[in-house]
Curated annotation (Swiss-Prot):
Keyword Methyltransferase: yes
Listed name of the protein: Ribosomal RNA small subunit methyltransferase H
Assigned keywords, A-Z: Cytoplasm, Methyltransferase, rRNA processing, S-adenosyl-L-methionine, Transferase
UniProt-listed GO biological process terms: rRNA base methylation
Family as reported in the entry's similarity comment: Belongs to the methyltransferase superfamily. RsmH family.
Organism name: Erythrobacter litoralis (strain HTCC2594)
Compartment(s): Cytoplasm
Recorded catalytic activity of this chain's protein: cytidine(1402) in 16S rRNA + S-adenosyl-L-methionine = N(4)-methylcytidine(1402) in 16S rRNA + S-adenosyl-L-homocysteine + H(+)
Highest taxon above the source species: Bacteria
Region span, Disordered: 287-315
Pfam families per UniProt: Methyltransf_5
């Protein structure tokens, strides 16, 4: 792979506008993936520290010419983005000018059947971003029905989680993404041509559980709070309500304001604001959705870091 990204990331123009990268800026792309955001940030003249726990993404990024400049303008970190404070400290970087996060599975991972993230093509039931630790098959073939049901309900918002869990138990062992998709479709009923495959929620839930994605997001947001300089910008793209809820609540809690007891009462200042200029939810245009259907469910929220000290949990 060259320096040109193989996949166009969602809300690219909006993310770049939110970060407003300038030559000489030091930025973090917390979710490198195929490198779409990183490419745009590098083109602005910035230096980018890019994180990804997927070794395939890191291997592809290592071929980019910016990694070979002296000093390099692209520094790759094969680790979780929740570790960005410690990783950048090791690289001699105490603060950065901007952080971009694109949460969840990457297009590159979805398009590789052997990674086991999607049911559009049959592949091993894996779903691990890092390719280390227990796989989706390990979890589904060993967990009790109650645990599986809880995961499906909490992370997939699957209302019929217990029915699906019982069907999974009855069909074990499951080895491929096709095995899991067929079990879920049979349990819930699948009409050809339905707008949404009933297996979607189960795949999302299992993937989030296997990779600890929501805890990673929470820790990553606090890491960004600690790392951003005063005036630095945070931009987070999420793809479902669970993620967006976490981002929204984080920014609300960092705004320094508490909501009134009534919608008719104003918010009141309760602590120093950690972030200001907090945006409302930004959605992709119809034109972008037409170009890239995966953008349909995406939401961007962005904010600017103040000079208030980070909260203890951000350290």
């Amino acid at each position: 792979m060259s320096g040109a990204a193989a996949h166009v990331p969602v809300l690219l123009d909006e993310v770049v506008a939110a970060l407003d990268p300038q030559p000489g800026d030091v930025l973090v792309d917390a979710t490198f993936g195929a490198g779409g955001y990183t490419r745009a940030l590098l083109d602005s003249g910035a230096t980018v520290h890019a994180f990804d726990r997927d070794p395939d993404a890191i291997a592809a990024g290592s071929q980019w010419p910016e990694t070979k400049e002296e000093p390099p303008r692209l520094v790759l970190h094969p680790r979780r983005f929740s570790e960005m404070v410690h990783a950048l400290a090791e690289a001699g970087v105490a603060q950065v000018d901007g952080v971009a996060m694109d949460i969840g599975v990457s297009s590159m991972q979805l398009d590789q059947a052997q990674r086991g993230f999607a049911f559009s093509a049959d592949g091993p039931l894996d779903m691990r971003m890092s390719q280390h630790g227990p796989s989706a098959a390990d979890f589904l073939n060993s967990a009790e029905a109650e645990e599986i049901a809880d995961v499906l309900y909490q992370y997939g918002e699957e209302r019929q989680s217990r029915r699906v869990a019982r069907a999974i138990i009855a069909a074990r062992p499951l080895e491929t993404t096709g095995d899991l998709a067929r079990v879920v479709r049979k349990a819930l009923g699948y009409r050809v041509g339905a707008p949404k495959d009933p297996a979607t929620r189960t795949f999302q839930a299992v993937r989030i559980h296997v990779n600890g994605e929501l805890d990673e997001l929470r820790e990553g947001l606090h890491a960004a709070e600690h790392l951003l300089r005063s005036g630095g910008r945070l931009a987070v793209v999420s793809f479902h309500s669970l993620e967006d809820r976490i981002v929204k609540r984080f920014l609300q809690s960092a705004s320094g304001k508490a909501g009134g007891t009534s919608r008719y009462l104003p918010q009141t200042d309760v602590s120093p604001a950690i972030f200001s200029d907090i945006s409302k939810a930004i959605r992709p245009s119809e034109a972008e959705i037409a170009r890239n259907p995966r953008a349909r469910s995406s939401t961007l929220r962005h904010a600017t870091r103040t000079d208030a000290p980070p909260r203890k949990e951000a350290a």
